[in-house]
Amino acid sequence: MNQETTWFGQPRGLTVLFLTNMWEQFSYFGMRALLVYYMTKQLLIGQAQSSFIYGTYTAMAYFTPIVGGVIADRYLGKRKAVIIGASIMALGHFMMAFEALFFFALAAIALGNGLFLPSLPSQVGDLYKRDDPRRGWAFNIYYVGINIGGFLAPLICGTLGELYGWHYGFGAAGIGMVAGLIIYLAGQKHLPPEQPRRPAANDQAREGFNRHTILLLLGVGLSVTVFRAAYEQIGNTVALWADSGVDRAAGTFQIPMTWFQSLNPLFVMLLTPPLLAYWRRHAHKETQGSLVRRMALGSLIVGSAYLLLAAVTATTGEALAGWVWLALFFLVLTFGELFILPTGLGLFARLAPPHLGATTVASWFLVIFSGSLTAGLVGTLWSSFEPSGYFLLLAAFAAVAALLLRGISSVADPETKG
């Protein structure tokens, strides 16, 4: 393993994984920024059905990694799984340029994602020894890569799709996926060696796991499922509100509706460095319990962001809300997100046995699957509520998740169980 350090004092392989992930996320967020608008404005699918399709697609994109992680660990290996998965996803993104292939394209992206998604972040963990303190910070750096791609995608894919034609936006997303694949192939020598594949050994499957660890992961997973029912609305019903309920005029310029999807990843990039610096100074106090408490605080902050939207929509009534309120919402939501999502992914990777890295990370994506599916169902309620009441409901979901996580944190450390 190449231990030469570069950016942020991390192994060179992290740069390869960071850039690969960045371009994959560019393709994902580029397509996501267009998806609900494409269905309602181009395919003329109703709002409730479009929200459900959106939620089902995002859910399936995170369900397939459950199987894909097992396939990567037992049969293909992580590198081959990433290459095959990225190739299938690129094909799916290009298929999105053709209306007749819409549902086939969504299926291809979800299937390719199943191989790609658990295999790439689990290689981040493989770059380090299990007791290396840089391991946890690496996932926050990796998370910035997600959000650089997420920031650029709505500006490029969204602008092309909204102003020049939906299919140009989808095509740009496909090009991003190809760029990520090329970077991954070119950087193979810097990646961690493959862990030995150990098919079907039940005793090995149990190695490294105990009852306390399993219950901890289940409890955190359930809590994050509830949280994501609210969080995932940023690309669904919040995006619809940005189109219909927000005054997007900035002087004489009309801000494209897809551009607001760039605010979340932009704020991630701005807020991550100071938060990382703070957490690094307090790393010596870090325990499993403190990580779960951090997640609880994050969920509470996200709930306050939705409370802000509830107050704004209740105050404005039928009038359009100023776009500054939407920007402030994304700032508060993103601050809370950084406390919960990268921390949760890092916790799952931290507790994973070495030979089950992709499988354990895949279980984190099972959490995202269940949360996205719940979010799709919650999204169908948008037309049945006043915006203020709907955003209040989302705040309640985030608050419940915070309470669950706070309760779990008290028994999260092995020495405190029982």
Language model features by range: what are they?
Residues 1-12, 129-133, 157-253, 275, ...:
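Intracellular loop-helix junctions on the cytosolic face of multi-pass helical membrane proteins
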Residues 22, 92, 101-116, 318-339:
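Hydrophobic core of transmembrane alpha-helices in multi-pass small-molecule transporters
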Residues 33-49, 234-260:
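Short amphipathic helix-loop junctions that connect adjacent transmembrane helices
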Residues 55-72, 117, 262-275:
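Central cavity-lining transmembrane alpha-helices of secondary-active solute carriers
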Residues 61, 134-162, 169-180, 184, ...:
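Glycine-rich segments within core transmembrane alpha-helices of 12-TM secondary carriers
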Residues 65-97:
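Conserved MFS/SLC helix-loop-helix module at the cytosolic interface between two early adjacent transmembrane helices
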Residues 84-104, 297-318:
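C-terminal ends and interior cores of transmembrane alpha-helices
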Residues 253-283, 298-306:
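Transmembrane alpha-helices of Major Facilitator/SLC transporters
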